[in-house]
């Protein structure tokens, strides 16, 4: 029977008055205890995971331990952890949403043996707060009382260890109840986990950091920063329009002086604001860190500043270069932080000389984050000299107003600076990507497909699904080396003469049940992470590379969408959605499909499915396949033309392939060439995504997952318009239709690079496409600007995107006859779906950043050991696409590289090009105009660089110890580069990234075998992309310095 209590809350209003609120609080005789020792499992009604039965004790951390040591409690070795509701609420109220979400995710994670016990709703555990009792004492008393109840509830069969930092609680409760022990967290680790070295090191680091914070708070220091305003003042200011709320974005090229606050989160009533708000200098930033949700006060207009437009290297001192900034823009200062965005940071210790300069016995060390946007962090350690050659992870603990730098603590070592695995681990940590293997519980949910026990289509599914194995020619077209084939196509002529177009997608949701362990894991990962040399799958390989991969010649479950098209106009007559069984006839690569489309039938010898056929069968099947590819392409052209008529954009992106020579060395970087068959497949997928979006929105208008692409801000197109104007083109950006038409017309017949650069600028001006719940915004906001579609979603890649799994479940619920049953297990509420969309958007952004950074690793690897003074491949043609006050921005078409080239060096000398067009540095000055920049020396020589000029560029590497190495560009001639005979571009097809990794690893293995080093054999499924469970063969690359990879990022103020 429920018992009713009253909880009294005292809140302070904006006017400073105290408001007394009384709320009803109901207590239950039974709440889920999640213990396998529960004597009344039916009454406790356990939902979700249970604590492991293979433990010697349960551990219950009090509120302070949860707040300070959560990162240790995350260790998978620590098992049997019971988080009390009281402790969780304390984290939520005192540490903010980020820490609370971290705790929630830990509780949801099936790989961690921990549960939540709702002690404040259990009749015997709930304790009212006594008069005069502090909140901290009440929380500790409540947790201890719940621990005692839990021990007796399990019939005294499992000892309970309560860990606390409250010495009074240890003395009071330590020997009060037999079987319930109360000790400090440090003693707990010493006694129960003496061999868990990483936990002990982290605990010592946290303790030392905490002691120093306490000591600093007792000392008297001058204020380095103003105090943040109280929360109630900030909220009142936002509501009244005096303050503006937004996310702080630090300019990584001028991290000490420039940051910006985006306006979309603002509530300001100031209608004059049409741009971001500039936060100039560290004082105005007031201890906020990149990504924090901040509250900003605008400065008077006479104090507004402009952003700097000069190029600037990241490792410069951020001092003003003397160049005039842009026009003044809204400028403000941070007055408070609503939500901190602190995360794990990869840092580098100072060099030996720098450490010695701080004093021989110095324990407080300033470490430099790998991310330029993060300030130096002060940590306490006696290992500074030991760790100075390593990349390490630290976490920020606090940033007091009396300290110039934030305080943090050491977490763990990643690897040596410059080593491949250390650099890859850096990219993963910086993007908050976790790559731990799938757990045993998750793998137990997976189907079995082995030679001894092969997977087969079940008779039940055969009855429920439409069988397309004999009636349809189904085939896939994918990149070389692709193993996770999640989409196939079909096209055929119907009896009435019309055509039937089919898109068939792997039925992942058949194998991944809602809220199962593997579903929760896939939701957490949200996407498959593709790096240049490896991938980290969202789903186990038994699904992603086998049973959910629509490989040729095997039966597979699919979710299909099939349209009946008019035979002449290709207009859609009807559409069918449903679950099917398919058997793909061909697994084609893009290149082979394009050759067949172009009529080059000799490529048939490279298609495995044709090898064992007799000539007659071979000819018949070839004609059938060629007709299907041709018809698909014709349909795709029609579909694309319709979208083009509505304003669909064709934008520019550069993807680079890596070529190897005969000796397995990286020989060349070649931008991939687009093929028409790429567009054919893409149009079919876009069509399927569009129709599924319409279907799920019609059925679930308030809780469907769609993808929106908002129109870009017009001011973002200013550079595009000015550059086009320099070539005599006019770019109309009023709508996607006018923009698309303008870009199509902006073609220079003498230089096709111009149109590519203009499209690239248009891409940079675009907003990001985002997932959203249809219940969270108005229908007119559903539009996808880039694709020119009113509704769009992602349905076609459920192997590698969790959003597609959600959409598959929505579609199945929409077409299900028994909707009530489907809806119950498959659909999120609008609120939960919107939260999930935010998470997926965040993970997608992390995936994009990590892929870009790892690709830049290979670009840097290519140039790392080449002598730029003598190596012809370090010389290339470059095209100027932007003018700055002290240099230009260049695009290198051959390698797909963008970067900056200075026209004035650090010594104040300017570039000069003599009669032979070769450059040298001389005293002089620069004069910047709208579309050109002129360098004039003191002896009267001058050279002018215009937008879209072709120049000769030298490419080299700029090394950095604390950050990633970067590519550096230098103009050596104001004339285009003429490729010599010895430098002709090879005509052979570029190798894919996966093939590159195989070749590089092979050469490493051979070198190691020559040294008689034993190498453990890695399972075949991990060879493709080097996704390994333990130590990888990549650790062996340390022995071959010429293959060491270093991250490349654009290191200039662009």
Curated annotation (Swiss-Prot):
CDD domains from the xrefs? PIN_Rrp44-like (cd09862)
Which PROSITE patterns does the annotation name? RIBONUCLEASE_II
| Catalytic activity annotation | Exonucleolytic cleavage in the 3'- to 5'-direction to yield nucleoside 5'-phosphates
Specify one Pfam family: Rrp44_S1
Every copy of the CSD1 domain together lies at 236-309
Specify the RNB domain's residue ranges: 465-816
Q: Which residues carry this modification: Phosphoserine?
A: 989
Needed cofactors, names only, are: Mg(2+)
> GO CC: one term?
cytoplasmic exosome (RNase complex)
SUPFAM superfamilies tied to this protein: Nucleic acid-binding proteins (SSF50249)
Q: Which domain of life is it from?
A: Eukaryota
Q: Which UniProt keywords apply?
A: Cytoplasm, Exonuclease, Exosome, Hydrolase, Magnesium, Nuclease, Phosphoprotein, RNA-binding
Q: What is its EC number?
A: 3.1.13.1
Question: Which residues belong to any copy of the CSD2 domain?
Answer: 365-431
- Gene Ontology molecular functions: 3'-5'-RNA exonuclease activity; enzyme binding; exoribonuclease II activity; RNA binding
Under SMART domains, the record lists: RNB
- Principal place of residence: cytoplasm
The outcome of changing residue 486 to N is:
Complete loss of exonuclease activity
Q: Which GO terms describe its biological process?
A: mRNA catabolic process; RNA catabolic process; RNA processing; rRNA catabolic process
Q: Where in the cell is it found?
A: Cytoplasm
Member of which family? Belongs to the RNR ribonuclease family.
What role does this protein play?
A: Catalytic component of the RNA exosome complex which has 3'->5' exoribonuclease activity and participates in a multitude of cellular RNA processing and degradation events. In the cytoplasm, the RNA exosome complex is involved in general mRNA turnover and specifically degrades inherently unstable mRNAs containing AU-rich elements (AREs) within their 3' untranslated regions, and in RNA surveillance pathways, preventing translation of aberrant mRNAs. It seems to be involved in degradation of histone mRNA.
Subunit composition and interactions = Component of the RNA exosome complex. The catalytically inactive RNA exosome core (Exo-9) complex is believed to associate with catalytic subunits EXOSC10, and DIS3 or DIS3L in cytoplasmic- and nuclear-specific RNA exosome complex forms.
The molecule here is called DIS3-like exonuclease 1
Q: Which organism is it from?
A: Homo sapiens (Human)
Q: Supply the gene name.
A: DIS3L
